[in-house]
């Protein structure tokens, strides 16, 4: 076959690497050589929602037993010294306290949602207690 002369044509954006790609490749290779890999972080709110679902499923007590027991003894000290408690009495107090707090936080969350917010504030707790009739 006979050789023919090539005519010049415009390039249609061939395969030449662009500068942006070169810098991206350099950025990717830099941490592999000497940098420290960042730890994985979940987006804000993801872990919170996971914890909410986990604690709503569970039935175990959320406050540690010994700190709660110390608090009960400290409060009881104001009324009478040298009081003794059965372990079942402390457990009953803890069950009742946690049930009360969970209910209060549910009502507090409803107050915050009513105010078109997702963050609970002290004024929400005050409103919830006032509606319940616990505080004038």
UniProtKB/Swiss-Prot annotation:
Modified residues (Phosphotyrosine): 42
Record-listed N6,N6-dimethyllysine modification sites: 5, 10, 28, 37, 80
Sequence positions bearing N6-(2-hydroxyisobutyryl)lysine: 5, 10, 15, 19, 24, 28, 37, 57, 65, 80, 123
GO CC annotations, alphabetized: nucleosome; nucleus
Modified residues (N6,N6,N6-trimethyllysine): 5, 10, 28, 37, 57, 80
Region described as Disordered: 1-45
Modified residue annotations for Phosphothreonine: 4, 7, 12, 81, 108
Modification N6-succinyllysine occurs at: 15, 57, 80, 123
Lipid moiety-binding residues (S-palmitoyl cysteine): 111
Superkingdom as given in the UniProt entry: Eukaryota
Modified residues (Phosphoserine): 11, 29, 58, 87
Positions of post-translational 5-glutamyl serotonin modification: 6
Entry-annotated residues carrying ADP-ribosylserine: 11, 29
Modified residues (N6-butyryllysine): 19, 24
Keyword list, A-Z: Acetylation, ADP-ribosylation, Chromosome, Citrullination, DNA-binding, Hydroxylation, Lipoprotein, Methylation, Nucleosome core, Nucleus, Palmitate, Phosphoprotein, Ubl conjugation
N6-crotonyllysine modifications at: 5, 10, 19, 24, 28, 57
Transmembrane segments: none
Lipid-anchored residues (N6-decanoyllysine): 19
Annotated positions of the Asymmetric dimethylarginine modification: 3, 18
Gene3D superfamilies: Histone, subunit A (1.10.20.10)
N6-(beta-hydroxybutyryl)lysine sites (modified residues): 5, 10, 15, 19, 24, 57
Pfam families associated with the record: Histone
Subunit architecture: The nucleosome is a histone octamer containing two molecules each of H2A, H2B, H3 and H4 assembled in one H3-H4 heterotetramer and two H2A-H2B heterodimers. The octamer wraps approximately 147 bp of DNA. During nucleosome assembly the chaperone ASF1A interacts with the histone H3-H4 heterodimer (via C-terminus of H3); this interaction is direct. Interacts with DNAJC9, CHAF1A and CHAF1B. Interacts with NASP; NASP is a histone chaperone that stabilizes and maintains a soluble pool of Histone H3-H4 dimers.
UniProt record similarity statement: Belongs to the histone H3 family.
Record's protein name: Histone H3.2
Taxonomic source organism: Cricetulus longicaudatus
């Amino acid at each position: 076959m006979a050789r023919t002369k090539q005519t010049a044509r415009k390039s249609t954006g061939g395969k030449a690497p662009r500068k942006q790609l070169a810098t991206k490749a350099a950025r990717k290779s830099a941490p592999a050589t000497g940098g420290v890999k960042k730890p994985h972080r979940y987006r804000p709110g993801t872990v919170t929602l996971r914890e909410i679902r986990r604690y709503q499923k569970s039935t175990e007590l959320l406050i540690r037993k010994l700190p709660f027991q110390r608090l009960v003894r400290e409060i009881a000290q104001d009324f009478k010294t040298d009081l003794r408690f059965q372990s079942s009495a402390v457990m009953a107090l803890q069950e009742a306290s946690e049930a009360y707090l969970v209910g209060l936080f549910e009502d507090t969350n409803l107050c915050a949602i009513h105010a078109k917010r997702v963050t609970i504030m002290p004024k929400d707790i005050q409103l919830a207690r006032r509606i319940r009739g616990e505080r004038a």
